[in-house]
Amino acid sequence: VIGGQECARDSHPWQAAVYHFSDIECGGVLV
């Protein structure tokens, strides 16, 4: 992310994770 900044804790509660079996491969957050 270019020009990004930290966000306040719990301000973006919608998170996603992509699993391959039991390993997390990628993740993201809805902003």
UniProtKB/Swiss-Prot annotation:
Residues 1-31 form the Peptidase S1 domain. Keywords: Hydrolase, Protease, Serine protease. The keyword Hydrolase applies. GO terms for molecular function: serine-type endopeptidase activity. The keyword Glycoprotein does not apply. It comes from the Eukaryota. It catalyses: Preferential cleavage of Arg-|-Xaa bonds in small molecule substrates. Highly selective action to release kallidin (lysyl-bradykinin) from kininogen involves hydrolysis of Met-|-Xaa or Leu-|-Xaa. Disulfide bonds: none annotated. GO terms for biological process: proteolysis. Glandular kallikreins cleave Met-Lys and Arg-Ser bonds in kininogen to release Lys-bradykinin. This is Kallikrein-1.
